[in-house]
Amino acid sequence: MQSQLSLMGKKEGMIHVFDKDGNLVACSVISMSSNVVTQIKVDSTDGYNAIQMGANEINVPEKTLHKRVNKPSIGHFKKSGSRVFRELKEVRLSEEAVNEVSLGSEFGLEVFESVSSIDVSGVSKGKGFQGVMKRFGFRGGPQSHGSGFHRHAGSIGMRSTPGRCFPGSKRPSHMGTVNVTVKNLEVIKIDLEKKVLLVKGAIPGPRGSVVVVRRSSRAKG
């Protein structure tokens, strides 16, 4: 069942560590508190099997909770009898796996103890409105004096036939703030005491953003 789980964590930044061969490796640091099951969905009532998990508990007095959480969410947590969380995520599971889980069950980094590689999903950094050279790596025009253009896209269509620009062509537009998954990242270290996971390489998003960690889809076994 644990091989099907996806858990939420927080990107803390990047550091350098030495591996067992003495090589300096750039690592991303992911902190991960316990993910708590807040709802269980079964095929007979919901049409599919899944669990909903919460992370980053909101610890405030109940009388001020309405200032942090909207009423529908408060009612949702009260119905399940769970604590109130800032982040929620639904994970599809098999029928057998759902039957093994109960409300309030907690999952943490121990899920990945025997895993050598993981996939990490997150929302990439927003870059705002950008041109084609930054978005797609276009070469641009001549940089010399007298050039008609330097950073333009260049030709984007023909003349009378077809007499239009094909849709989907690469143009200047908004860049970033999209869901990105980086696959098959090597797990360097898991610190259960500090609740920290070190993975080789970069992961999506800025520091402090929420990322989703799962067992690599390319992992063997």
Swiss-Prot record:
GO terms for biological process: translation. It comes from Chlamydia abortus (strain DSM 27085 / S26/3). One of the primary rRNA binding proteins, it binds directly near the 3'-end of the 23S rRNA, where it nucleates assembly of the 50S subunit. Part of the 50S ribosomal subunit. Forms a cluster with proteins L14 and L19. Belongs to the universal ribosomal protein uL3 family. One of its GO terms (cellular component) is cytosolic large ribosomal subunit. Pfam families: Ribosomal_L3 (PF00297). PROSITE patterns: RIBOSOMAL_L3. The keyword GTP-binding does not apply. The keyword Transmembrane helix does not apply. It comes from the Bacteria. GO terms for molecular function: rRNA binding; structural constituent of ribosome. Keywords: Ribonucleoprotein, Ribosomal protein, RNA-binding, rRNA-binding. This is Large ribosomal subunit protein uL3. InterPro entries: Ribosomal_uL3, Ribosomal_uL3_bac/org-type, Ribosomal_uL3_CS, Transl_B-barrel_sf.
